[in-house]
A protein has these predicted regions:
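Sec-type signal peptide cleavage vicinity
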Residues: 2-332
Length: 332
């Protein structure tokens, strides 16, 4: 297992948060997601939270650490009246920067907490899904839908606030490989991750620390690795070494110390035979804002009908009557 850090390089998202009121028009980055017109002077009730740095993103490119805002991403901010406000717009496509328009009044403080609860979150409530899915290898566009989240303290003054968004979940990056010819003919259909404690459920982003709090009961996550076209039956297992492009899969979990059992479900569609290969990992501290390489050599031992002997026997137990012989007695 190899730990990779999101800090600064990856998931510490730097953003410029400019508080601009009625006379600030939006740039071409603005993409309205509601009936609010974000390009007129009628927006006196909106504040602009502008993501300025190229590192301000929410989906992951593993190789170079590049992140991007994805379609449907929203941020939440609590205003001077203590009211939760969701950005009235969101990107409609993958983008490196974006200007979020947020309702509410933000003039009483030089610090405001910014929340990204994921695409399916609300305010500071986050759900890490027990059922996760990825449509193609080495894709992270799904992580915001299954529990990726983050918080930041926006600080500044005179209408300009800067913040660095820290992601509060941990991500497991599964990279199975095999040298077994039979397994190379199979497809990876799903990955089951089971913990000795909770790794999935509904949590709260603490309004002081920004970290995930609360106790959920979910101890198992199933990642389905199927999409369309060449991935309709699952991800290939043709690689003899770890290779993200072939079958890399990203699973979001609650950070913490977990002992994990991982079951790789594979299927040979030619014979319609399927099964699971199990790997265990001792207790380890999976920290927030980090991702972890979970490489695994998945293999099976092939016992043919001639490998069963009684003590000190000269011939195998089913000699002449193996399951694959002309006169089989051996059960299968």
């Amino acid at each position: 297992m190899r730990k990779q850090t999101f800090k600064v390089r990856l998931l510490s998202l730097i953003a410029l948060c400019g508080i601009v009121m009625a006379f600030a028009s939006c740039s071409n980055e603005d993409v309205a997601q509601s009936t609010v017109d974000t390009n007129t002077e009628n927006n006196s009730n909106l504040t602009s939270f502008v993501t300025g740095a190229a590192a301000t993103r929410t989906s992951l490119n593993y190789d170079d650490g590049a992140f991007f805002w994805e379609a449907g991403d929203h941020i939440y901010v609590k205003d001077d009246n203590g009211t939760w406000n969701k950005s009235s717009n969101a990107p409609t496509e993958k983008t490196a920067s974006f200007k979020f328009m947020v309702p509410g009044k933000y003039t009483n403080s030089t610090t405001y907490k910014v929340y990204y609860p994921g695409k399916n979150g609300l305010n500071n409530n986050v759900t890490i899904s027990a059922a996760q899915s990825q449509a193609q290898p080495n894709s992270t566009t799904h992580i915001g839908e299954v529990g990726d989240c983050g918080t930041a303290d926006a600080t500044g003054g005179n209408g300009v606030f800067n913040f660095r968004l820290d992601h509060q979940a941990a991500i497991l990056v599964f990279q199975p490989f095999t040298n077994n010819t039979g397994i190379k003919n199979c497809q990876l259909t799903k990955i089951e991750v089971t913990s000795d404690n909770d790794i999935t459920g509904t949590y709260t982003l603490d309004t002081t620390t920004g970290e995930l709090t609360g106790s959920a009961s979910g101890k198992s996550i199933t990642m389905t690795t199927k999409g369309s076209g060449s991935y309709a039956n699952g991800f290939p297992l043709t690689n003899s070494a770890a290779d993200l492009a072939t079958n890399g899969a990203y699973v979001v979990i609650r950070p913490g110390t977990h002992a994990l059992t991982v079951r790789y479900w594979i299927k040979d569609y030619a014979t319609n035979v399927e099964g699971a290969i199990t790997k265990t990992y001792p207790a380890f501290d999976y920290e927030k804002n980090d991702y972890y390489d979970m490489t695994a050599n998945i293999n099976v031992t092939d016992y043919d009908g001639r490998q069963y002997y009684q003590w000190d026997a000269q011939n195998n137990f089913w000699n002449g009557h193996e399951w694959d012989s002309a006169d089989p007695w051996q059960p299968v």
